[in-house]
């Protein structure tokens, strides 16, 4: 209009052509950028030969997008026909007219619904973009940013309506909602895929009779689909009505003349579909009763089964009937009366659930709660134990002798040989001062593991291994140039390996492997009967560069014309080039362009340092690497490094490589029927350590092995991506020997066991037999006793094995009730054993023993002398260890200077619950404990061990 009024109509068509050309240019640039990113992702997955899996993921997303676009196109078509119908029937008889405050209330209501819908859809789209595998439980995701969404969207909607015209504002709001809807459906591919692929478990939940797999797979997908569809349909309806309500003549007169009969009839099918969707959502919400917790019972209780479930079923059926009555079928008579009846029943059922349920709970359930809830408590106990594998625990009753004897020492000789005296924190503190060697190296954690140094000895030596990684954040500021960060400082190097049960003469850790590069030192231990050759044979070092690790690392480009820092030797640095097979090729100009656009890094195009063999190394943090390959798995906890040789028969492993990261991956669910949340409030009702990921520390190659083949969730993903996973039996045996039950899974099982070790519903209801994790004094702080690894015997007739152990005490009492032990060796991997102590005989727990230690006159006097001399006494983790037919309590004592000194292992305190002894080493302490420093043997050395029968060897 402005162009025509100025007499410039001749320029209108060229201007329109110019705008369309710019639009096509922008679309072409966007498509080209997308193509470059797709190419890099394709090549990245190509290094693992998993392009087929990536293609299937893209096809699932494309299918979801096409389905969403079909819904969006239908909504747009309906809206366009509505607008045409509005113009055509403008002179017809109208109804539903609004005047004055009623008109204002209608405008306000429509506005609130539109903004609320946009908030919900934009929230779901945000989750779909950044946390797509959390969409199945989007309702439990925190909504801290709700006002950050409401206020901007309200302002945007108002601005659109004011600046662009009210009708156009409604259209744009609808387009925004359609965009968010499409993103949510496309990015939610994991929900639809798993829902279609998850197999039935054969376990039926007792309330509705559905298979447990429905809650694990189908329910999250159906709930999300119905919610997002309902939001889209309501948005379409409200924006369409807004365009009618907010006409200029209506706003000026504050009067809405109403809708014509044809418009009302055209609106009814859409309202009917909305009601059908709402009915389906209400029907589905009956299943939600199975994983809600109100009061005593996890899952549906008596009130849910006898009141809420029937009311929801009734409300759903009433709304379903109402939906059919809204749709203008000619064969339905007395439509208005039937609609009134259906609406009264539906609304009444919903109101009764809200208003009547608290009264029935107070008046009917509470007075007879135990009797009414007993069947449901039994269901909750069984389901929770099943969901967290507590039902497979083997329970053993033990009654330890009150006093340690020489016979116990002889029977527990293999246990004594691996008593852990070094905690991870003192060892890390020492390593960081003695073994980091340069400011840019970092030891992130110390992992407990075991290695077989002597082939003819059944038990393996327990060790702590710490990887020496490169921490670019620690580089001096002058060294943080772009070339240094991405071309020179590309990797860490080597690791340290220490026995957990010995110390050097100065109190510092012993090392089997220390230092790095050509200065790497391999040492044996005469105390343990391990030679240098044993270490060299059992722990090959080989190519020790760590390009992939625990620490977040930026992308690296290697090999290049610039040499990479390999390791320092004295005042000099040794340089090398990356020779691994992993990485995205960037040797060609078009590959460099793709990498530059992928990384938003134009400097790649003119660096001049790349060669024809150069590769781009991205996702170098091993957990991020596993998540990128299998985003449907949860990667929890710290990975740990293993150094071992893999047989040449395993073609998928590089022959010269010895360092591998083991990463624990999980499947989980919040919708396992009748299972309880964690005691700490986390909404987790099912957990399996379903996958063990092996990541090559040099080349970054990833292998995924299924460790829980009966888990229905991982079985579903195996159906979808059969080439991605291998059975655990195909893992090289040298790596399988280093698998261990992850501490994170074990902690979750311990939390649930605190209450769900009880299977009697009466005792469970009364809460008389609840356990707790005991506390101990570590340094100067009282902390919960963390699970600890020991190599011990579960019975006097069994060989020692690698165990993860957690002592447990009764709630509010310090006596020891039980141990939960997780087995990690051979065919026993993953099995849980509960060692229960007699309730009538008090067994001292860690807190009581620690109190006795601190009350001992000689020990407290010695601690005071050290304290006055300027040293800080750190009492380490108190271990409670089964030994023969008795218990042994062991606590290491460290000394360090108050101002950041090195922790040194100075003393070892031992006790059997009656007597306490402190000595310079474990052997002396045990001799003093048993019979006052006698010369009888204490078996701490392999060479001192009595012969081991072949039948006692570990598998």
UniProtKB/Swiss-Prot annotation:
Xref: InterPro entries: UPF0182
Membrane topology according to the record: Multi-pass membrane protein
Listed name of the protein: UPF0182 protein PMT_0755
Transmembrane domains' residue ranges: 25-45, 58-78, 107-127, 146-166, 178-198, 214-234, 264-284, 313-333, 340-360
Subcellular location field: Cell membrane
Organism in which the protein naturally occurs: Prochlorococcus marinus (strain MIT 9313)
Signal peptide (UniProt feature, chain positions): none
GO CC, alphabetical: extracellular region; plasma membrane
Family: Belongs to the UPF0182 family.
Source organism superkingdom: Bacteria
Major subcellular location class: membrane
Keyword terms: Cell membrane, Membrane, Transmembrane, Transmembrane helix
């Amino acid at each position: 209009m402005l162009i025509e009024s100025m007499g410039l109509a001749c320029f209108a068509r060229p201007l329109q052509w110019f705008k369309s050309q710019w639009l096509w240019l922008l679309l072409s640039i966007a498509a080209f950028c997308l193509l470059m990113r797709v190419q890099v992702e394709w090549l990245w997955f190509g290094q693992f030969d998993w392009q087929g899996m990536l293609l299937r993921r893209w096809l699932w997303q494309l299918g979801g997008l096409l389905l969403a676009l079909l819904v969006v196109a239908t909504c747009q078509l309906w809206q366009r026909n509505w607008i045409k119908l509005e113009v055509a029937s403008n002179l017809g008889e109208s109804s539903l007219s609004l005047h004055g405050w009623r008109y204002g209330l209608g405008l306000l209501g429509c506005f609130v619904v539109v903004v609320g819908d946009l908030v919900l859809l934009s929230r779901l789209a945000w989750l779909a973009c950044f946390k797509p595998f959390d969409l199945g439980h989007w309702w439990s995701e925190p909504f801290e940013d709700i006002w950050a969404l409401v206020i901007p969207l309200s302002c945007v909607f108002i601005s659109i309506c004011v600046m662009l015209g009210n009708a156009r504002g409604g259209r744009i709001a609808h387009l925004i909602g359609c965009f968010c809807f499409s993103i949510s459906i496309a990015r939610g591919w994991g929900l639809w895929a798993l829902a279609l692929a998850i197999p039935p478990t054969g376990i039926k939940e007792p309330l509705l009779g559905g298979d447990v797999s429905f809650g694990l797979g189908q329910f999250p997908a159906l709930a999300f689909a119905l919610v997002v569809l309902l939001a889209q349909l309501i948005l379409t309806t409200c924006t369409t009505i807004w365009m009618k309500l907010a006409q200029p003549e209506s706003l000026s007169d504050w009067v809405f003349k109403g809708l014509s009969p044809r418009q009302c009839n055209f609106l009814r099918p859409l309202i009917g579909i909305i009601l059908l969707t709402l009915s389906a959502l209400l029907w589905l919400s009956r299943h939600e009763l199975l994983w809600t917790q109100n009061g005593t019972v996890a899952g549906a209780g008596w009130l849910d089964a006898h009141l809420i479930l029937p009311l929801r079923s009734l409300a759903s059926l009433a709304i379903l009937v109402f939906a059919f009555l809204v749709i203008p079928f000619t064969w339905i008579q007395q439509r208005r009366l039937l609609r009134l009846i259906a609406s009264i029943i539906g609304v009444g059922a919903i109101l009764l659930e809200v208003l009547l349920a608290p009264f029935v709970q107070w008046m009917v359930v509470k007075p007879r709660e135990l009797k009414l809830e007993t069947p449901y408590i039994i269901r909750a106990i069984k389901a929770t134990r099943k969901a967290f594998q507590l039902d497979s625990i083997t329970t053993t009753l033990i009654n330890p002798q009150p006093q340690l004897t020489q016979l116990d020492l002889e029977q527990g000789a293999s246990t004594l040989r691996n008593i852990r005296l070094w905690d991870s924190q003192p060892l890390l503190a020492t390593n960081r001062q003695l073994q980091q060697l340069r400011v840019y190296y970092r030891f992130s954690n110390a992992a407990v593991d075991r290695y077989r140094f002597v082939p003819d000895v059944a038990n393996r030596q327990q060790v702590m291994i710490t990887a020496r990684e490169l921490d670019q954040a620690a580089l001096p500021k002058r060294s943080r140039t772009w070339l240094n960060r991405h071309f020179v400082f590309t990797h860490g190097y080597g690791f340290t390996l220490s026995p957990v049960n010995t110390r050097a003469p100065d109190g510092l850790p012993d090392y089997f492997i220390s230092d790095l590069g050509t200065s790497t030192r391999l040492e044996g231990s005469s105390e343990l009967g391990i030679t240098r050759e044993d270490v060299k044979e059992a722990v090959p070092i080989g190519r020790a560069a760590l390009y992939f690790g625990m620490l977040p690392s930026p992308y690296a480009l290697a090999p290049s014309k610039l040499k990479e820092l390999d390791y320092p030797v004295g005042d000099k640095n040794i340089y090398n080039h990356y020779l691994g097979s992993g990485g995205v090729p960037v040797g060609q100009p078009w590959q460099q362009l793709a990498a530059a656009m992928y990384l938003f890094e134009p400097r790649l195009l003119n660096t001049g340092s790349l060669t024809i063999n150069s590769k781009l190394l991205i996702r170098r943090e091993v957990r991020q690497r596993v998540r990128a390959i299998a985003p449907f798995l949860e990667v929890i906890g710290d990975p740990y490094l293993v150094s071992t040789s893999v047989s040449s028969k395993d073609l998928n492993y590089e022959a010269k490589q010895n360092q591998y990261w083991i990463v624990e991956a999980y499947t989980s669910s919040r919708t396992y029927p009748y299972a309880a949340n964690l005691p700490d409030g986390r909404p987790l009702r099912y957990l399996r350590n379903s996958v063990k990921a092996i990541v090559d520390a040099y080349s970054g190659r990833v292998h995924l092995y299924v460790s829980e083949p009966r888990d229905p969730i991982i079985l579903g993903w195996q159906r979808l991506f059969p080439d991605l996973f291998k059975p655990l039996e195909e893992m090289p045996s040298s790596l399988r020997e280093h698998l261990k039950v992850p501490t994170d899974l074990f902690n979750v099982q311990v939390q649930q066991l605190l209450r769900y070790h009880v299977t009697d519903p009466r005792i469970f209801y009364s809460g008389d037999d609840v356990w707790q994790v005991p506390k101990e004094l570590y340094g100067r702080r009282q902390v919960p006793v963390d699970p600890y690894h020991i190599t011990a015997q579960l019975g006097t007739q069994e060989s020692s094995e690698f165990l993860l152990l957690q002592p447990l005490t009764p709630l509010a009492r310090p006596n020891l009730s039980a141990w939960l032990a997780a087995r990690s060796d051979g065919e026993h991997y993953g099995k849980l054993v509960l060692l229960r102590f007699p309730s009538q005989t008090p067994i001292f727990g860690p807190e009581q023993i620690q109190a006795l230690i601190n009350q001992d006159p000689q020990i407290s006097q010695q601690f005071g002398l050290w304290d006055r001399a300027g040293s800080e006494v750190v009492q380490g983790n108190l271990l409670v260890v089964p030994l023969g037919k008795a218990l042994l309590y062991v606590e290491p004592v460290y000394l360090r200077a108050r101002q950041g000194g090195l922790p040194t292992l100075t003393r070892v305190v031992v006790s059997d619950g009656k007597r306490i002894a402190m000595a310079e080493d474990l052997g002396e302490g045990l001799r003093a404990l048993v019979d006052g420093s006698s010369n009888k043997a204490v078996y701490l050395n392999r060479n001192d061990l009595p012969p081991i029968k072949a039948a006692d060897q570990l598998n």
